């Protein structure tokens, strides 16, 4: 049985979030939460919250052993990009792209 949680329009670059997601993909939930808790960057905090939400969703399903849950997959998709302009010299402007991510965590019952 699977459990999933999604966070959309998160203000973190998909490229940076994928680096963190690769570290915990396929691990037991307890190990993944420990790694994310002590990883000192913004994507780790966001993925940690989505992982907790997926675990809470799994507790609502009947007949699921929450202690045996494994991170089956973490999907980081690109969300819309917010465009801003930074004024520069002589009337010019530079485009700033603030990237967003859609983060999905899928948990499954598995053998450790």
Curated annotation (Swiss-Prot):
<dbReference type="InterPro" id="IPR001063">
    <property type="entry name" value="Ribosomal_uL22"/>
</dbReference>
<keyword id="KW-0687">Ribonucleoprotein</keyword>
<dbReference type="GO" id="GO:0022625">
    <property type="term" value="C:cytosolic large ribosomal subunit"/>
</dbReference>
<dbReference type="InterPro" id="IPR018260">
    <property type="entry name" value="Ribosomal_uL22_CS"/>
</dbReference>
<dbReference type="GO" id="GO:0003735">
    <property type="term" value="F:structural constituent of ribosome"/>
</dbReference>
<comment type="function">
    <text>This protein binds specifically to 23S rRNA; its binding is stimulated by other ribosomal proteins, e.g. L4, L17, and L20. It is important during the early stages of 50S assembly. It makes multiple contacts with different domains of the 23S rRNA in the assembled 50S subunit and ribosome.</text>
</comment>
<keyword id="KW-0689">Ribosomal protein</keyword>
<dbReference type="Pfam" id="PF00237">
    <property type="entry name" value="Ribosomal_L22"/>
</dbReference>
<dbReference type="InterPro" id="IPR047867">
    <property type="entry name" value="Ribosomal_uL22_bac/org-type"/>
</dbReference>
<keyword id="KW-0699">rRNA-binding</keyword>
<keyword id="KW-0694">RNA-binding</keyword>
<dbReference type="GO" id="GO:0006412">
    <property type="term" value="P:translation"/>
</dbReference>
<protein>
    <recommendedName>
        <fullName>Large ribosomal subunit protein uL22</fullName>
    </recommendedName>
</protein>
<dbReference type="InterPro" id="IPR005727">
    <property type="entry name" value="Ribosomal_uL22_bac/chlpt-type"/>
</dbReference>
<comment type="subunit">
    <text>Part of the 50S ribosomal subunit.</text>
</comment>
<dbReference type="InterPro" id="IPR036394">
    <property type="entry name" value="Ribosomal_uL22_sf"/>
</dbReference>
<comment type="function">
    <text>The globular domain of the protein is located near the polypeptide exit tunnel on the outside of the subunit, while an extended beta-hairpin is found that lines the wall of the exit tunnel in the center of the 70S ribosome.</text>
</comment>
<comment type="similarity">
    <text>Belongs to the universal ribosomal protein uL22 family.</text>
</comment>
<dbReference type="GO" id="GO:0019843">
    <property type="term" value="F:rRNA binding"/>
</dbReference>
């Amino acid at each position: 049985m699977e459990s999933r949680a999604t966070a959309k329009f998160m203000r973190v670059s998909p490229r940076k979030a994928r680096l963190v997601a690769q570290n915990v993909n396929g691990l037991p939930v307890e190990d993944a939460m420990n790694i994310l808790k002590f990883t000192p960057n913004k994507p780790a905090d966001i993925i940690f919250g989505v992982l907790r939400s997926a675990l809470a969703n799994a507790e609502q399903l009947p007949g699921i052993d929450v202690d045996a849950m494994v991170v089956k997959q973490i999907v980081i998709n690109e969300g819309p990009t917010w465009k801003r302009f930074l004024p520069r010299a002589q009337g010019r402007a530079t485009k700033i792209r603030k990237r967003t991510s859609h983060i999905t965590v899928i948990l499954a019952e598995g053998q450790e």
